Amino acid sequence: EALTLANVSQLLWSAQGVTHPDGWRTAPSAGAAFPLELYLVAGNVNGLAQGLYRYRADQHKLIQLGNKDLRADLAGAAPGQEWMKGSAIIIVIAAVYDPATRKYGQRGIRYAQMEVGHAAQNVYLQAASLNLGTALVGAFDDKRVKEVLKLPSGEQPLGLMPVGGR
């Protein structure tokens, strides 16, 4: 079942949308470091071409990075999670630890990981309000996900959130 572009927009905003002129976001961030990066793997969205996108929270905008449907590739990088191929989209939550570790040392890694939980919970709540289903998948091969998405060396994938109709 296809998602609407409005639904996708709302899901991404719920995870990392800017809520204040100072750049604060929908999910709390230790020291306002905002280490998270969101990617969208679009497979079945009305009004949006299949492909890989980066979410620019500061502009509430998608930047297309590629036009290949990567849902099957991500499912292949997540053993036992083949069902992900059938989702309309997959939201990928990655972290750039540097902003958090610069301020908090190694503890910044923990703070970034906690922030993933906040962002994911917001997606869960927004999905439920839109009568959509999702799950936070952490069982994946980090290296393979980085390769599939061509993530920059400083970014670490921390969660995959397939979303579809219930």
Regions found by a protein language model. Give the residues of each.
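Solvent-exposed coil/turn segments that connect beta secondary-structure elements
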Residues: 16, 43-45, 57-58, 94-98, ...
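Short, surface-exposed helix-loop/turn micro-motifs enriched in polar/charged residues
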Residues: 30, 134-137, 153
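Small-aliphatic-rich amphipathic alpha-helix that forms the alpha element of a beta-alpha
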Residues: 11, 38, 89-93, 97-99, ...
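N-terminal amphipathic, basic helical "cap/leader" segment at the start of enzyme domains
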Residues: 1-87
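A glycine-rich helix N-cap at a beta->alpha junction
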Residues: 150-166
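Short, charged, solvent-exposed linker or helix-capping segments at domain edges/interfaces
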Residues: 50, 102-103
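Conserved hydrophobic/aromatic beta-strand scaffold that supports enzyme active sites
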Residues: 54, 90-92, 160
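Short, mixed-charge aromatic SLiMs
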Residues: 60-61, 144-154
